[in-house]
Swiss-Prot record:
GO molecular function: D-serine ammonia-lyase activity; hydro-lyase activity; pyridoxal phosphate binding
Source species of the chain: Escherichia coli (strain 55989 / EAEC)
Keyword Lyase: yes
Residues modified to N6-(pyridoxal phosphate)lysine: K118
Quaternary structure (record): Monomer.
Organism ancestry: Bacteria, Pseudomonadati, Pseudomonadota, Gammaproteobacteria, Enterobacterales
Keywords carried by this UniProt record: Lyase, Pyridoxal phosphate
Protein name: D-serine dehydratase
Co-factor(s): pyridoxal 5'-phosphate
Gene Ontology biological process terms in this record: D-serine catabolic process; isoleucine biosynthetic process
NCBIfam families per record: D_Ser_am_lyase, PRK02991.1
EC number: 4.3.1.18
Family statement drawn from the similarity comment of this UniProt entry: Belongs to the serine/threonine dehydratase family. DsdA subfamily.
Family annotation (SUPFAM superfamilies): Tryptophan synthase beta subunit-like PLP-dependent enzymes
Catalytic activity, as annotated: D-serine = pyruvate + NH4(+)
Length: 442
């Protein structure tokens, strides 16, 4: 971006200066509305989410047999919700900032099949596509036992079709593993940030991995192009897919059920704050949408991004969405948080969700490494760096009197708050790699 343009952008949005300087930044969204007001802009409804629930239930018998690790939950792919009181104390000590209420961790990092939040959206979109093809071919009805999809006849049928996706790693893992299991030919276009072990794991499942020297945006574009020339190839579009988004959104009702089971209350007197790591935006956007449908105005969602890849904060704050990239303002998009190394946000998610998100913040790679180490020490839970992005949220919210006043939170409401950090990945990181991460923490 030329200097004059840059100067006028900074004059209009002074916060951009802090982003350019790679400062850890917090922006509380002044444009937040009620759910009733913000919902129409999403373009999806409660019914769409219910349909996604129903589809996953139809596939449950299949998943329970195809992936024995899901058998115990009857083929439902869901993660644990755990309290992390020792980590809460450690954060308070390190940041000299009390965190009111209770701190919980949502362990999507340990979801079965692919060990990340992408096991929600990625697997769902592959299943939705498989169902559509099988229904259209007259091989399946909605009332069938879907475990029949494991038969050689179906494998043969699906092998005529292929799936392509562009990914920094975790989405590729979930889509690659699921597609290969169903019988699709699958190609994952991986950006330069993708970890070697993720590529190796995909290849071990018979997935074709195409590697790029460039970032996520290029991998997605190339994947899209490659798919266009083949009518039997379905491209899963991480930047714009409503189906992926709905796969993530199912998490809202599921979390509500987990809260009920644990006897936790979310209402006007007991607000819920959720901190979601954000790459291109589909995962956190879909989850936040589901949470809003489940808990209404009593849930407050925040997106967390690396200082080197603040694409969603930049897009929503300036209102330019996918018309601006972090590279345009001189940021390199290089971060250890490979799952979040995205330079240009999803225009669909930014525009759909900007009224339903309370804020956005950035944190440095070093902060992620530090918190990765603290969590391992205090709670014995090991995550990959990007999964710690949410962990910086509670102290930012608790430290901001202006945010608390903007929403009219009383001292009592803050005392009764639940802070939920969404851990997005790390359950399948090889030991050797994990030890390298742990060595970088302070």
């Amino acid at each position: 971006m030329e200097n004059a343009k840059m100067n006028s952008l900074i004059a209009q949005y002074p916060l951009v200066k802090d982003l350019v300087a790679l400062k850890e930044t917090t922006w509380f969204n002044p444009g937040t509305t009620s759910l009733a007001e913000g919902l129409p802009y999403v373009g999806l409804t409660e019914q769409d989410v219910q349909d996604a629930h129903a589809r996953l239930s139809r596939f449950a018998p299949y998943l329970a047999k195809a992936f024995p690790e899901t058998a115990a939950t009857g083929g439902i792919i869901e993660s644990e919700l755990v309290a992390i009181p020792a980590m809460q104390k450690r954060l308070e000590k390190e940041y000299q900032q009390p965190i009111s209420g209770q701190l919980l961790l949502k362990k999507d990092s340990h979801l079965p099949i692919s060990g990340s939040i992408k096991a929600r959206g990625g697997i769902y979109e592959v299943l939705a596509h498989a169902e559509k093809l099988a229904l259209e071919a007259g091989l399946l009805t909605l009332d069938d036992d879907y475990s029949k999809l494991l038969s050689p006849e179906f494998k043969q049928f699906f092998s005529q079709y292929s799936i392509a996706v562009g990914s920094t790693g975790n989405l590729g893992l979930s889509i690659g593993i699921m597609s290969a299991r169903i019988g699709f030919k699958v190609t994952v276009h991986m950006s330069a940030d993708a970890r070697a072990w993720k590529k190796a794991k995909l290849r071990s499942h018979g997935v074709t991995v195409v590697e790029y020297e460039q970032d996520y945006g290029v991998a997605v574009e190339e994947g899209r192009k490659a798919a266009q020339s083949d009518p039997n190839c379905f491209f899963i579009d991480d930047e714009n897919s409503r189906t992926l988004f709905l796969g993530y959104s199912v998490a809202g009702q599921r979390l509500k059920a987990q809260f009920a089971q644990q006897g936790s209350i979310v209402d006007a007197d007991n607000p819920l704050f959720v901190y979601l790591p954000c790459g291109v935006g589909g995962g956190p956007g879909g989850v936040a949408f589901g949470l809003k449908l489940a808990f209404g105005d009593h849930v407050h969602c925040f997106f967390a991004e690396p200082t080197h890849s603040p694409c969603m904060l930049l897009g929503v704050h300036t209102g330019l969405h996918d018309q601006i990239s972090v590279q345009d303002i001189g940021i390199d998009n290089l971060t250890a948080a490979d799952g979040l190394a995205v330079g240009r946000a999803s225009g669909f998610v930014g525009r759909a969700m900007e009224r339903l998100l309370d804020g956005f913040y950035t944190l440095s790679d070093q902060t992620m490494y530090d918190m990765l180490g603290w969590l391992a020490q205090e709670e014995g839970i090991r995550l990959e760096p990007s999964a710690l992005a949410g962990m910086a949220g509670p102290q930012r919210v608790c430290a901001s009197v202006s945010y608390q006043q903007m929403h009219g939170f009383s001292a009592e409401q803050l005392r009764n708050t639940t802070h939920l950090v969404w851990a997005t990945g790390g359950g399948m990181v090889p030991e050797e790699e994990m030890n390298q991460y742990l060595a970088k923490g302070r």
